[in-house]
Protein backbone atom coordinates (compact mmCIF):
# COMPACT_ATOMS: atom_id res chain seq x y z
CA UNK A 1 0.00 0.00 0.00
CA UNK A 2 1.38 3.40 -0.97
CA UNK A 3 1.92 6.22 1.51
CA UNK A 4 -0.85 8.18 -0.17
CA UNK A 5 -3.43 5.41 0.17
CA UNK A 6 -2.42 4.68 3.76
CA UNK A 7 -2.92 8.31 4.77
CA UNK A 8 -6.16 8.60 2.82
CA UNK A 9 -7.53 5.58 4.67
CA UNK A 10 -6.47 7.03 8.02
CA UNK A 11 -8.33 10.24 7.21
CA UNK A 12 -11.47 8.48 5.95
CA UNK A 13 -11.69 6.47 9.19
CA UNK A 14 -12.43 9.70 11.04
CA UNK A 15 -16.17 10.50 10.68
CA UNK A 16 -15.66 14.23 10.26
CA UNK A 17 -19.13 15.31 9.20
CA UNK A 18 -19.36 19.12 9.02
CA UNK A 19 -18.25 20.95 11.15
CA UNK A 20 -16.35 18.16 12.89
CA UNK A 21 -12.69 17.47 12.15
CA UNK A 22 -12.30 14.38 14.36
CA UNK A 23 -8.51 14.65 14.49
CA UNK A 24 -7.86 14.78 10.75
CA UNK A 25 -5.96 18.05 10.95
CA UNK A 26 -3.90 16.81 13.90
CA UNK A 27 -2.90 13.79 11.84
CA UNK A 28 -1.81 16.04 8.98
CA UNK A 29 -0.10 18.53 11.28
CA UNK A 30 2.02 15.83 12.93
CA UNK A 31 3.45 14.84 9.58
CA UNK A 32 3.98 18.42 8.45
CA UNK A 33 5.70 19.37 11.71
CA UNK A 34 8.34 16.74 11.01
CA UNK A 35 9.13 18.63 7.79
CA UNK A 36 9.68 21.91 9.59
CA UNK A 37 6.24 23.41 9.16
CA UNK A 38 5.10 25.88 11.80
CA UNK A 39 1.71 24.58 12.92
CA UNK A 40 -0.98 27.12 13.74
CA UNK A 41 -4.43 25.80 14.65
CA UNK A 42 -7.18 28.38 14.22
CA UNK A 43 -10.44 27.51 15.94
CA UNK A 44 -13.42 29.77 15.32
CA UNK A 45 -16.67 28.85 17.07
CA UNK A 46 -17.46 25.24 16.07
CA UNK A 47 -14.91 25.08 13.25
CA UNK A 48 -11.39 23.68 13.32
CA UNK A 49 -8.88 25.22 10.93
CA UNK A 50 -5.20 24.63 10.29
CA UNK A 51 -2.60 27.03 8.94
CA UNK A 52 0.77 25.35 8.51
CA UNK A 53 3.74 27.05 6.86
CA UNK A 54 7.28 26.05 5.96
CA UNK A 55 9.51 29.02 5.19
CA UNK A 56 9.15 32.73 5.78
CA UNK A 57 9.96 34.21 2.39
CA UNK A 58 7.90 34.63 -0.75
CA UNK A 59 6.58 33.45 -3.05
CA UNK A 60 4.10 31.46 -0.96
CA UNK A 61 2.55 28.31 -2.42
CA UNK A 62 -0.54 27.03 -0.60
CA UNK A 63 -2.50 23.79 -0.67
CA UNK A 64 -6.10 24.43 0.44
CA UNK A 65 -8.75 21.92 1.34
CA UNK A 66 -11.24 20.64 3.87
CA UNK A 67 -11.41 17.73 6.28
CA UNK A 68 -15.18 17.83 6.72
CA UNK A 69 -17.46 15.58 4.70
CA UNK A 70 -21.18 15.45 4.00
CA UNK A 71 -23.33 12.93 5.90
CA UNK A 72 -23.12 9.34 4.69
CA UNK A 73 -26.82 9.01 3.97
CA UNK A 74 -28.62 5.65 4.24
CA UNK A 75 -26.03 3.17 5.52
CA UNK A 76 -27.85 0.20 4.01
CA UNK A 77 -27.14 1.60 0.54
CA UNK A 78 -23.37 1.44 1.03
CA UNK A 79 -21.46 -1.62 -0.18
CA UNK A 80 -19.09 -1.12 2.76
CA UNK A 81 -19.38 1.08 5.87
CA UNK A 82 -18.67 4.68 4.81
CA UNK A 83 -16.07 5.31 7.50
CA UNK A 84 -14.31 1.97 7.13
CA UNK A 85 -12.17 2.59 4.03
CA UNK A 86 -12.06 -0.44 1.78
CA UNK A 87 -10.24 -1.17 -1.46
CA UNK A 88 -12.08 -3.44 -3.88
CA UNK A 89 -10.81 -4.10 -7.40
CA UNK A 90 -8.41 -1.19 -7.14
CA UNK A 91 -11.08 1.27 -6.01
CA UNK A 92 -11.00 3.01 -2.62
CA UNK A 93 -14.46 3.33 -1.06
CA UNK A 94 -15.38 5.64 1.81
CA UNK A 95 -16.98 8.98 2.58
CA UNK A 96 -14.45 11.61 1.61
CA UNK A 97 -12.41 9.38 -0.69
CA UNK A 98 -12.96 11.84 -3.54
CA UNK A 99 -14.18 14.91 -1.65
CA UNK A 100 -11.61 15.47 -0.44
CA UNK A 101 -9.54 13.33 1.90
CA UNK A 102 -7.86 11.63 -1.03
CA UNK A 103 -6.59 15.02 -2.18
CA UNK A 104 -5.38 15.88 1.33
CA UNK A 105 -3.36 12.68 1.49
CA UNK A 106 -1.87 13.34 -1.94
CA UNK A 107 -0.93 16.88 -0.89
CA UNK A 108 0.86 15.80 2.29
CA UNK A 109 2.79 13.01 0.61
CA UNK A 110 3.69 15.25 -2.34
CA UNK A 111 5.17 17.80 0.05
CA UNK A 112 7.05 15.11 1.98
CA UNK A 113 8.65 13.88 -1.23
CA UNK A 114 9.36 17.38 -2.52
CA UNK A 115 11.03 18.52 0.71
CA UNK A 116 13.13 15.35 0.80
CA UNK A 117 14.44 16.18 -2.68
CA UNK A 118 14.61 19.97 -2.19
CA UNK A 119 15.17 20.71 1.51
CA UNK A 120 16.36 24.22 0.66
CA UNK A 121 13.61 25.05 -1.82
CA UNK A 122 12.85 28.66 -2.63
CA UNK A 123 9.85 30.48 -1.20
CA UNK A 124 7.42 28.94 1.26
CA UNK A 125 4.82 26.16 1.31
CA UNK A 126 1.61 26.31 3.32
CA UNK A 127 -1.54 24.34 4.05
CA UNK A 128 -4.90 26.02 4.68
CA UNK A 129 -7.32 23.36 5.89
CA UNK A 130 -10.83 23.79 7.33
CA UNK A 131 -13.66 21.66 8.69
CA UNK A 132 -16.34 24.06 7.45
CA UNK A 133 -16.39 23.80 3.65
CA UNK A 134 -19.43 21.56 3.25
CA UNK A 135 -21.48 23.60 5.74
CA UNK A 136 -22.24 27.29 6.28
CA UNK A 137 -18.63 28.30 5.44
CA UNK A 138 -18.73 31.08 8.03
CA UNK A 139 -15.90 30.13 10.37
CA UNK A 140 -13.61 28.31 7.97
CA UNK A 141 -11.40 29.48 5.13
CA UNK A 142 -12.87 32.98 5.10
CA UNK A 143 -11.86 33.54 8.76
CA UNK A 144 -8.36 32.18 8.16
CA UNK A 145 -7.94 34.49 5.17
CA UNK A 146 -9.08 37.43 7.29
CA UNK A 147 -6.39 36.53 9.84
CA UNK A 148 -3.69 36.24 7.20
CA UNK A 149 -4.73 39.50 5.58
CA UNK A 150 -4.60 41.31 8.92
CA UNK A 151 -0.97 40.34 9.35
CA UNK A 152 -0.11 40.95 5.68
CA UNK A 153 0.60 37.29 4.92
CA UNK A 154 -0.04 36.92 1.19
CA UNK A 155 -0.59 33.70 -0.77
CA UNK A 156 1.00 33.80 -4.23
CA UNK A 157 -0.29 30.52 -5.66
CA UNK A 158 -2.98 28.18 -4.36
CA UNK A 159 -4.20 24.74 -5.41
CA UNK A 160 -7.56 23.79 -3.95
CA UNK A 161 -7.89 20.01 -3.90
CA UNK A 162 -11.54 19.84 -4.91
CA UNK A 163 -12.37 16.88 -7.18
CA UNK A 164 -12.06 18.65 -10.52
CA UNK A 165 -11.55 15.66 -12.81
CA UNK A 166 -14.35 14.02 -14.79
CA UNK A 167 -13.06 10.77 -16.33
CA UNK A 168 -9.30 10.60 -15.82
CA UNK A 169 -7.44 12.27 -12.99
CA UNK A 170 -6.07 15.55 -14.28
CA UNK A 171 -8.34 15.78 -17.32
CA UNK A 172 -9.88 19.00 -15.97
CA UNK A 173 -8.42 21.91 -14.06
CA UNK A 174 -10.89 24.43 -12.69
CA UNK A 175 -9.22 27.78 -13.27
CA UNK A 176 -12.16 29.77 -11.98
CA UNK A 177 -15.66 29.54 -10.59
CA UNK A 178 -18.90 31.37 -11.10
CA UNK A 179 -20.24 33.66 -8.41
CA UNK A 180 -23.29 32.66 -6.39
CA UNK A 181 -25.97 34.89 -4.91
CA UNK A 182 -29.31 33.81 -3.41
CA UNK A 183 -32.45 35.88 -3.08
CA UNK A 184 -35.13 35.25 -0.45
CA UNK A 185 -38.27 36.98 -1.67
CA UNK A 186 -41.43 37.66 0.32
CA UNK A 187 -44.40 38.94 -1.70
CA UNK A 188 -47.24 40.36 0.38
CA UNK A 189 -50.91 40.08 -0.47
CA UNK A 190 -54.17 39.94 1.47
CA UNK A 191 -55.52 36.62 2.72
CA UNK A 192 -59.16 35.86 2.03
CA UNK A 193 -61.81 33.40 0.89
CA UNK A 194 -61.42 32.04 -2.64
CA UNK A 195 -65.11 32.78 -3.26
CA UNK A 196 -64.53 36.48 -2.55
CA UNK A 197 -61.38 37.36 -4.50
CA UNK A 198 -62.38 41.04 -4.57
CA UNK A 199 -61.86 41.10 -0.81
CA UNK A 200 -58.38 39.59 -1.03
CA UNK A 201 -55.16 40.11 -2.96
CA UNK A 202 -53.52 36.93 -4.22
CA UNK A 203 -49.70 37.28 -4.09
CA UNK A 204 -49.22 34.23 -6.30
CA UNK A 205 -51.19 35.79 -9.14
CA UNK A 206 -49.37 39.09 -8.72
CA UNK A 207 -45.90 37.53 -8.59
CA UNK A 208 -46.30 34.92 -11.33
CA UNK A 209 -45.61 37.29 -14.27
CA UNK A 210 -42.55 38.69 -12.51
CA UNK A 211 -41.19 35.22 -11.79
CA UNK A 212 -41.82 34.18 -15.38
CA UNK A 213 -39.90 37.21 -16.60
CA UNK A 214 -37.01 36.49 -14.23
CA UNK A 215 -36.83 32.93 -15.54
CA UNK A 216 -36.97 34.04 -19.19
CA UNK A 217 -34.42 36.85 -18.91
CA UNK A 218 -31.06 36.45 -20.63
CA UNK A 219 -28.82 37.95 -17.99
CA UNK A 220 -25.65 37.89 -20.08
CA UNK A 221 -24.06 35.90 -22.90
CA UNK A 222 -21.13 34.59 -20.87
CA UNK A 223 -17.62 34.94 -22.24
CA UNK A 224 -14.63 32.86 -23.30
CA UNK A 225 -14.23 31.51 -19.77
CA UNK A 226 -17.74 31.39 -18.31
CA UNK A 227 -21.13 30.13 -19.50
CA UNK A 228 -24.03 32.60 -19.38
CA UNK A 229 -25.35 33.56 -15.96
CA UNK A 230 -28.14 31.25 -14.83
CA UNK A 231 -31.23 31.96 -12.72
CA UNK A 232 -33.06 29.14 -10.95
CA UNK A 233 -35.99 29.13 -8.54
CA UNK A 234 -35.11 26.70 -5.76
CA UNK A 235 -38.07 26.92 -3.39
CA UNK A 236 -41.55 28.41 -3.54
CA UNK A 237 -44.31 28.26 -0.93
CA UNK A 238 -47.64 29.89 -0.14
CA UNK A 239 -51.02 29.09 1.35
CA UNK A 240 -52.40 27.39 4.43
CA UNK A 241 -52.93 24.00 2.86
CA UNK A 242 -56.66 24.64 2.58
CA UNK A 243 -58.19 24.84 -0.89
CA UNK A 244 -60.59 27.66 -0.01
CA UNK A 245 -58.10 30.22 1.31
CA UNK A 246 -56.28 32.80 -0.80
CA UNK A 247 -52.79 33.08 0.69
CA UNK A 248 -51.57 36.30 2.24
CA UNK A 249 -47.91 35.78 1.45
CA UNK A 250 -45.71 34.09 -1.14
CA UNK A 251 -42.16 32.99 -0.33
CA UNK A 252 -39.69 32.38 -3.16
CA UNK A 253 -36.02 31.46 -2.94
CA UNK A 254 -33.89 31.75 -6.07
CA UNK A 255 -30.22 31.58 -6.97
CA UNK A 256 -27.96 33.13 -9.58
CA UNK A 257 -24.71 31.53 -10.72
CA UNK A 258 -23.06 34.45 -12.44
CA UNK A 259 -20.12 35.08 -14.69
CA UNK A 260 -17.56 37.86 -14.67
CA UNK A 261 -19.84 39.72 -17.09
CA UNK A 262 -21.98 40.75 -14.09
CA UNK A 263 -21.41 41.89 -10.53
CA UNK A 264 -23.67 40.99 -7.64
CA UNK A 265 -24.71 44.66 -7.55
CA UNK A 266 -25.82 44.44 -11.20
CA UNK A 267 -28.00 41.46 -10.34
CA UNK A 268 -29.55 43.06 -7.29
CA UNK A 269 -30.40 46.25 -9.16
CA UNK A 270 -31.89 44.47 -12.17
CA UNK A 271 -34.01 42.09 -10.08
CA UNK A 272 -35.34 44.83 -7.83
CA UNK A 273 -36.13 47.06 -10.81
CA UNK A 274 -38.09 44.20 -12.39
CA UNK A 275 -40.07 43.54 -9.21
CA UNK A 276 -40.80 47.26 -8.84
CA UNK A 277 -41.99 47.42 -12.44
CA UNK A 278 -44.51 44.66 -11.69
CA UNK A 279 -45.87 46.66 -8.76
CA UNK A 280 -45.21 44.06 -6.10
CA UNK A 281 -45.31 44.70 -2.37
CA UNK A 282 -42.24 42.73 -1.41
CA UNK A 283 -39.24 42.23 0.83
CA UNK A 284 -36.05 40.83 -0.71
CA UNK A 285 -33.03 39.64 1.27
CA UNK A 286 -29.79 38.74 -0.50
CA UNK A 287 -27.03 36.31 0.48
CA UNK A 288 -23.80 36.52 -1.49
CA UNK A 289 -21.92 33.22 -1.27
CA UNK A 290 -19.01 34.27 -3.44
CA UNK A 291 -17.82 36.41 -6.31
CA UNK A 292 -16.66 34.82 -9.58
CA UNK A 293 -12.93 34.38 -9.94
CA UNK A 294 -10.63 33.48 -12.81
CA UNK A 295 -6.98 32.52 -13.20
CA UNK A 296 -6.59 32.74 -16.96
CA UNK A 297 -2.79 32.98 -17.08
CA UNK A 298 0.20 32.87 -14.77
CA UNK A 299 2.93 30.62 -13.45
CA UNK A 300 0.62 28.38 -11.40
CA UNK A 301 -1.60 27.43 -14.31
CA UNK A 302 1.41 26.82 -16.56
CA UNK A 303 3.07 24.65 -13.91
CA UNK A 304 -0.09 22.62 -13.35
CA UNK A 305 -0.68 21.97 -17.04
CA UNK A 306 2.95 20.93 -17.50
CA UNK A 307 2.92 18.66 -14.43
CA UNK A 308 -0.29 16.95 -15.51
CA UNK A 309 1.02 16.33 -19.02
CA UNK A 310 4.21 14.84 -17.55
CA UNK A 311 2.21 12.38 -15.42
CA UNK A 312 -0.63 11.26 -17.69
CA UNK A 313 0.36 12.61 -21.11
CA UNK A 314 -2.84 14.59 -21.39
CA UNK A 315 -3.40 18.32 -21.56
CA UNK A 316 -6.20 19.25 -19.17
CA UNK A 317 -9.28 21.19 -20.12
CA UNK A 318 -9.58 24.51 -18.31
CA UNK A 319 -13.15 24.96 -17.03
CA UNK A 320 -15.12 27.19 -14.68
CA UNK A 321 -18.27 25.05 -14.47
CA UNK A 322 -19.79 23.53 -11.36
CA UNK A 323 -20.51 24.87 -7.91
CA UNK A 324 -18.55 27.17 -5.65
CA UNK A 325 -15.47 26.28 -3.62
CA UNK A 326 -13.34 27.92 -0.96
CA UNK A 327 -11.22 29.28 -3.78
CA UNK A 328 -13.71 32.17 -3.82
CA UNK A 329 -12.32 33.36 -0.49
CA UNK A 330 -8.68 33.07 -1.53
CA UNK A 331 -8.76 34.58 -5.03
CA UNK A 332 -9.82 38.09 -3.90
CA UNK A 333 -6.49 38.41 -2.05
CA UNK A 334 -4.74 38.50 -5.42
CA UNK A 335 -3.56 34.89 -5.37
CA UNK A 336 -3.53 32.74 -8.48
CA UNK A 337 -6.04 29.97 -7.66
CA UNK A 338 -6.88 26.71 -9.42
CA UNK A 339 -8.61 23.48 -8.44
CA UNK A 340 -7.03 20.12 -9.15
CA UNK A 341 -8.27 16.88 -7.66
CA UNK A 342 -9.60 13.38 -8.36
CA UNK A 343 -12.59 12.27 -10.44
CA UNK A 344 -15.83 13.71 -9.10
CA UNK A 345 -18.34 11.13 -10.39
CA UNK A 346 -19.32 9.84 -6.93
CA UNK A 347 -18.96 12.87 -4.67
CA UNK A 348 -21.77 13.32 -2.11
CA UNK A 349 -23.22 9.95 -3.19
CA UNK A 350 -23.47 6.63 -1.39
CA UNK A 351 -20.50 4.42 -2.21
CA UNK A 352 -18.26 7.44 -2.81
CA UNK A 353 -15.04 6.15 -4.29
CA UNK A 354 -11.91 6.90 -6.26
CA UNK A 355 -9.42 4.72 -8.09
CA UNK A 356 -6.58 4.11 -5.66
CA UNK A 357 -3.98 4.58 -8.38
CA UNK A 358 -5.49 7.99 -9.17
CA UNK A 359 -4.46 9.31 -5.77
CA UNK A 360 -0.87 8.26 -6.40
CA UNK A 361 -0.98 10.01 -9.77
CA UNK A 362 -2.46 13.08 -8.11
CA UNK A 363 0.42 13.18 -5.62
CA UNK A 364 2.84 13.05 -8.56
CA UNK A 365 1.03 15.98 -10.17
CA UNK A 366 1.12 18.03 -6.97
CA UNK A 367 4.81 17.28 -6.53
CA UNK A 368 5.41 18.26 -10.14
CA UNK A 369 3.76 21.63 -9.59
CA UNK A 370 5.93 22.28 -6.54
CA UNK A 371 9.06 21.35 -8.47
CA UNK A 372 8.19 23.73 -11.31
CA UNK A 373 7.53 26.64 -8.95
CA UNK A 374 9.85 26.26 -5.97
CA UNK A 375 12.70 23.85 -6.79
Swiss-Prot record:
Transmembrane segments: none annotated. Its EC number is 3.5.1.18. Disulfide bonds: none annotated. It holds the Pfam family Peptidase_M20. It is an enzyme of class 3 (hydrolase). The active site is at 68, 133 (proton acceptor). It comes from the Bacteria. Keywords: Amino-acid biosynthesis, Cobalt, Diaminopimelate biosynthesis, Hydrolase, Lysine biosynthesis, Metal-binding, Zinc. PROSITE patterns: ARGE_DAPE_CPG2_2. Its cofactor is Zn(2+); Co(2+). The keyword Metal-binding applies. Zn(2+) 2 binds at residues 99, 134, 348. Binds 2 Zn(2+) or Co(2+) ions per subunit. It catalyses: N-succinyl-(2S,6S)-2,6-diaminopimelate + H2O = (2S,6S)-2,6-diaminopimelate + succinate. Pathway: Amino-acid biosynthesis; L-lysine biosynthesis via DAP pathway; LL-2,6-diaminopimelate from (S)-tetrahydrodipicolinate (succinylase route): step 3/3. InterPro entries: ArgE/DapE_CS, Bact_exopeptidase_dim_dom, DapE_proteobac, Peptidase_M20, Peptidase_M20_dimer, Peptidase_M20A. Zn(2+) 1 binds at residues 66, 99, 162. One of its GO terms (biological process) is lysine biosynthetic process via diaminopimelate. GO terms for molecular function: acetylornithine deacetylase activity; cobalt ion binding; succinyl-diaminopimelate desuccinylase activity; zinc ion binding. NCBIfam families: dapE_proteo, PRK13009.1. Catalyzes the hydrolysis of N-succinyl-L,L-diaminopimelic acid (SDAP), forming succinate and LL-2,6-diaminopimelate (DAP), an intermediate involved in the bacterial biosynthesis of lysine and meso-diaminopimelic acid, an essential component of bacterial cell walls. Homodimer. Belongs to the peptidase M20A family. DapE subfamily. HAMAP family: DapE. This is Succinyl-diaminopimelate desuccinylase. It comes from Aeromonas hydrophila subsp. hydrophila (strain ATCC 7966 / DSM 30187 / BCRC 13018 / CCUG 14551 / JCM 1027 / KCTC 2358 / NCIMB 9240 / NCTC 8049). The lineage of its organism: Bacteria, Pseudomonadati, Pseudomonadota, Gammaproteobacteria, Aeromonadales.
